[in-house]
UniProtKB/Swiss-Prot annotation:
Protein name: Proline--tRNA ligase
GO molecular function terms noted in the UniProt entry: aminoacyl-tRNA deacylase activity; ATP binding; proline-tRNA ligase activity
A GO CC term assigned to this protein in UniProt: cytosol
Cited InterPro entries: aa-tRNA-synt_IIb, aa-tRNA-synth_II, aa-tRNA-synth_II/BPL/LPL, Anticodon-bd, Anticodon-bd_dom_sf, Pro-tRNA-ligase_IIa, Pro-tRNA-synth_IIa_bac-type, Pro-tRNA-Synthase_IIa_type1
Species: Corynebacterium aurimucosum (strain ATCC 700975 / DSM 44827 / CIP 107346 / CN-1) (Corynebacterium nigricans)
Compartments, as annotated in UniProt: Cytoplasm
One of the GO BP terms on file: prolyl-tRNA aminoacylation
Protein family per UniProt: Belongs to the class-II aminoacyl-tRNA synthetase family. ProS type 1 subfamily.
Amino acid sequence: MITRLSELFLRTLREDPADAEVPSHKLLVRAGYVRRVAPGVYTWLPLGLRAMRKIEDVIRQEMNAIGGQEMLFPALLPREPYEESNRWTEYGDNLFRLKDRKGADMLLGPTHEEMFTTAVKDMYSSYKDFPVTLYQIQTKYRDEERPRAGVLRGREFTMKDSYSFDMTDEGLDESYARHRKAYQNIFDRLEIDYAICKATSGAMGGSASEEFLAVSEVGEDTFVRATEGEYAANVEAVVTQAPEEISFEGLPEAQEHETPKSETIESLVEWAKGAGITVDGREVTAADTLKCMMIKVAAPAATEEEKEWELAAVLIPGDRALDEKRLEASLEPAEFELAGEGDFKKNSFLVKGYVGPRVLNAHDVKVYADPRVVSGTSWITGADAPQRHVVGLVAGRDFTVDEFIEAAEVKEGDPAPNGQGTLTLERGIELGHIFQLGRKYTEAFDVQILDENGKRAVPTMGSYGIGVTRMLAVLAEQRHDEKGLNWPVAVAPYQVHVAVANKDAAALEAGQKLVEDLDRAGIEVLYDDRPKVSPGVKFKDAELLGMPFIAILGRAFADGIIELRIRGGETREVPADSIVDTLTELIRG
């Protein structure tokens, strides 16, 4: 295939767009791959669409290889199936809702578990029909509160979502393993640097859950890896190793103290040191103090007006910050907000900066706590009065915890949950997520299948998603330099970019012959045949657009030499009569 730049619908930009924050956003816009329509909504221009179709082709090949069958559901969906699964409310404001002319509630699909489940229910009735794996590649819609980073986090995006249906849990394990391997094949073929991380299931529900995270400094997700072994997890899924419970016997009674100028953990620790207070014979540290973070929690609701907020508290050691993403994952599907001034005024028993767990118990405020706050541990915390703290407040004796959750930050150097080494922190971008959903949706939709004994049984499900548009942005993030994009062969819109920098007739004729020879060899060619564009502009555009191989017919062509630039790598001088063979060999790897 030959595409001429003189005919391609394309305009490159020399300056970064004003609203672009990350390299992928800047370069995809500058190189003419995408164009912004509205916040989080983008047009895919010819080059961008070709690259995205290449990614889809790789996904289809690997999905078909594990027995997946492609289908396509509508994006416009009725309310009722999502009402049955409770996700009409669980998705909250992230759901695009609308009404048709008859007043019926509709939505733009954020994901399609409900539709796949009802399709299987309506069409299959015997165990002989199973197992089955179905998938689609389709546009999804989520009303992100803060769309950012171009197509990395948009409100409209393309996903591959697949679903396995098995009659047994062992069958689900096999389907999950096949998908896991298929995902590894996809990311390996696309040359993405990624990590497979233990994850939470969130609103999707289910048990086993893993994320495929692309390693990137601009990633919104933090993940950890153990310095030894193969443990890796999204920070939201890291499980704190709780200490052993301690006997209350022999522990001194809690004592209140005046603590002037102790509004922060740092100043409280300094006060304790100055007062000569020790813990097991050592100086007090921030880890001996206990923060009481006030929050509000509400069950999911379709609108803000329907939410019923309840006061709650989160107790975490003073040497840790509150990690709102971990807290959100722990509370899902419920939502939370940090308590504001109005909440403190409304609940006069709360003394801001000096809240302690005793007053929370006394007023029936739900208390969540970090797993380190086990029974028998002793803490320095607020005494529910200005400039006062209590020393030696013992969990389980002086206050109680309603529920232990993961809400404290994970730190570099924390012990690895697998017991092998310590944790290192990295940033990543979620590309894929696989879940063992179990029977959450098949039970919700009363999917009844006759098993081999003629008895009714409920099949079990797996859910597997890949962000197609996000994958393109990730490749732009991971594979670029100061000159522009640098696509792998499997994704590049064209495999070879040919530019004629010498304007004499012989070079122009040779350029035409070269692209025709490349086309006959089955190589996809982008041909810069623009007659009134300088060689310098052609070179800059070639590097910006990012095709893996750039063939230049320049001054050396008079001696029968074509300059071959391997994008992001070496430059070779190749005899014109062997350039097609050289490129064919390079493309085949």
